[in-house]
Amino acid sequence: MSGTTQLRPTYHGYVRDTTDALIIFEACLAGQLLHVPRRPHDRERQNVIKSGSIFVYEEHASGIKRWTDSITWSPSRIMGNYLVYRQLEKPFAPGEKKRAKGKGGKSTTQSGGISKPRQRNALPFQQGLEQGNEYPSVPSDEDRQLVGSLVDSYDFKEQGLVKKTISITYNGVPHHLISYYTVEDVKAGLLTSPADDQGLRGVVPRAELTNGQNFRAPIEESIGGAYMPGMRHSAGFPHPSAYPTLLHQPQMHQPQVHQPLAHQPQVHQPLAHQPQVHQPLAHQPQVHQQYVHQPQAHQPYMHQPQVHLNGYQPSYGDGQWWKYLGGT
């Protein structure tokens, strides 16, 4: 029977962002990691409900409608695509509303490792640990990445647990992930995220997990502005993630992508050749006027007969030639 089988967490580590959860969901669907078949029994909770334990269950097969762990939690807060809870020092009194404290409540330096925002020139929390401070100053944005808005609103348990939950639907079946961790363990780099786990390096979430969900926030969106997706924290300092997919590209620096101006080739429209229409010159035939011969009127030559003497033409040596014409 499943009730007699020792319950083991699906994974040990810390889910930093949505992609970490999707890697675990994918590994479960592929059989590399195992869904849990049931909720932990009372006698098991002390051993399995602890920092680093991550449980994934499939709602239909397990029959789990509501996950229980017998820990007193604060009201939930939305943090990206997760719901986050923090362990309380004590349960609310019967009939007491779960109302957040006012500004005059417990100091945040006594609230589960979360401290007031440090100044910009203050030492990082690692140096505070080296100096022996139990709860050194840390940037408030790092706190919010770990606990959301649950910083100083309730009486949180010292070094208490934080619970993060996220759900997906695959082929119409709901799958749920429950993650436990302490702020101190995450800051100390004691918990590995799935994206940094060499054993899960080749796990790439299928498209139905990344595109087919009703997530409130984009998968790569940073939560609170401190722990950016694609960054892991070893001893509290961020380092580039080794995960090879695009889901964990660092978001710290967004280089401006200069889109080259699309070259618009000039389309040279060929000049439409307008052929010149040569109108043939209309041949005007030359009208040859028929030459009308105008006969020249020739005056008849009046022949003056010469008088020959003895058959010879007389000479005019005497200069009186007219005498020979009959003149006087």
From Swiss-Prot:
GO cellular component terms listed in the entry, alphabetical order: nucleus
Q: Name one GO molecular function term.
A: DNA binding
Pfam families per the UniProt record, alphabetical: Gti1_Pac2
Per UniProt, the ranges with Low complexity bias are 106-116, 251-261, 282-293
Q: Which UniProt keywords apply?
A: Nucleus, Transcription, Transcription regulation, Virulence
Function statement:
Global transcriptional regulator of transcription that impacts, but is not absolutely required for secondary metabolism and pathogenicity on maize. Regulates synthesis of multiple secondary metabolites, including fumonisins and fusarins.
**UniProt-annotated location(s):** Nucleus
From the Swiss-Prot or TrEMBL record, give the protein name.
Global transcription regulator sge1
Domain of life of the organism encoding this protein: Eukaryota
Family recorded in the similarity comment: Belongs to the MIT1/WOR1 family.
InterPro entries cross-referenced by the UniProt entry: Gti1/Pac2 (IPR018608)
- Where primarily located? nucleus
Q: Where is this region: Disordered?
A: 94-120, 251-293
